[in-house]
Design a protein with these regions (language model features):
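DNA-contacting interfaces and partner/effector-binding or oligomerization modules
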Residues: 48-87
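C-terminal accessory module of base-excision DNA glycosylases/AP lyases that mediates lesion recognition
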Residues: 1-55, 61, 127-136, 146-152, ...
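Alpha-helical ds-nucleic-acid-binding substructure associated with the helix-hairpin-helix region
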Residues: 86-159
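Short alpha-helix boundary/capping elements
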Residues: 75-80, 93-97, 139, 177, ...
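Short, amphipathic alpha-helical segments that act as regulatory/interfacial helices
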Residues: 68-76, 86-90, 131-139, 214, ...
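Residues at alpha-helix boundaries and short interhelical turns
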Residues: 75-79, 125, 159, 177, ...
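Short, flexible active-site loops
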Residues: 68-71, 113-120, 150-151, 166-172
Length: 274
């Protein structure tokens, strides 16, 4: 067993994780929690995140606002730019009964202030058309009558909304553990652990990869919604340097330490067999 110790409100708290050589899912060992990007590392980090109050999901107060946030923050839009665009559009949505395509395009065409810079939104015309149609059709969705998967599937029928964006909306609206937001950061983390194969492509098999991710979360006793958000932040901070990391090796087959970046600065901990 591995003994993980952390400080919570100044008090040491601990939990135990399986031995590094044990499998969390077939073919994937837990690894050592103090070595970054192993399954045990993610389990320890998720546990500490929950100690600190968990995650706050949701960017909007209504389904329409959440769709706007996730669509504008989708493919090709850096997170900060997407949020800036959404902030501008949301203000109009809250002050005007109907926001038409022309108004949205005008808002997205104007430079956005991101930090101390002025930047332009890359897909102003395309996204304004998509969002305008989404807002026109979203009133027809009976959100309360749909379970998480059904809501996700319904949202994918809207223009510009694929399974990843739809899953993002559902996760944010419901803190759902039934869907996963499989962007490049989550895919890289899962490939590194061996949960996904090296050629994993959500565009070709979103549901299959999502099933593997959620299966891993359940086997590890983790909330998929929390782990998804945690992986996104961590892998995004690593950036392109992650490409140079080798996938974690299986301690049960090599007899050695898994290949991962060492150090988990938030943890005051020790690992051993007890």
């Amino acid at each position: 067993m591995q003994h993980v110790i952390s400080l919570h409100n100044g008090t040491p708290v601990s939990r135990f994780l399986p031995d590094p050589s044990e499998s969390v899912v077939p073919g994937v060992a837990w690894g050592r929690f103090e070595e970054a990007l192993t399954p045990a590392f993610w389990a320890a980090q998720a546990w500490m995140q929950e100690l600190g109050g968990g995650e706050a999901f949701g960017l909007g107060d209504t389904l329409a606002e959440e769709v706007a946030a996730c669509l504008l923050g989708g493919y090709g839009a850096p997170a900060e730019v997407g949020l800036a665009a959404y902030g501008r559009v949301r203000q109009a949505m809250r002050s005007t009964a109907v926001v038409d395509v022309g108004a949205i395009e005008a808002m997205l065409t104007m430079p956005l202030k991101v930090g101390d810079r002025l930047v332009r939104y890359r897909f102003a015309r395309q996204r304004s058309r998509q969002l305008g149609e989404c807002l026109a059709r979203i009133a027809d969705i009976d959100e309360a009558a749909l379970d998480d998967i059904s809501l996700r599937d319904t949202l994918t029928r809207l223009p510009g909304i694929g399974p990843k964006t739809a899953s993002w909306v559902v996760r944010n609206r419901r803190a759902s553990d039934e869907v996963a937001i499989l962007d490049i950061h989550i895919v890289r983390a899962c490939v590194h652990m061996g949960i996904f194969g090296g050629g994993a492509t959500p565009a070709r098999d979103y549901v299959g990869l999502e099933s593997r991710f959620i299966g891993f979360c359940r086997a590890a006793g983790l909330r998929a919604s929390l782990l998804d958000a945690l992986m996104w932040r961590t892998m995004r901070s690593i950036g392109p340097s992650f490409a140079g990391l080798r996938p974690a090796s299986n301690p049960s087959s090599t007899g050695g330490r898994s290949r991962g970046k060492t150090a988990c600065p938030e943890v005051v901990a020790q690992a051993g067999t007890i």
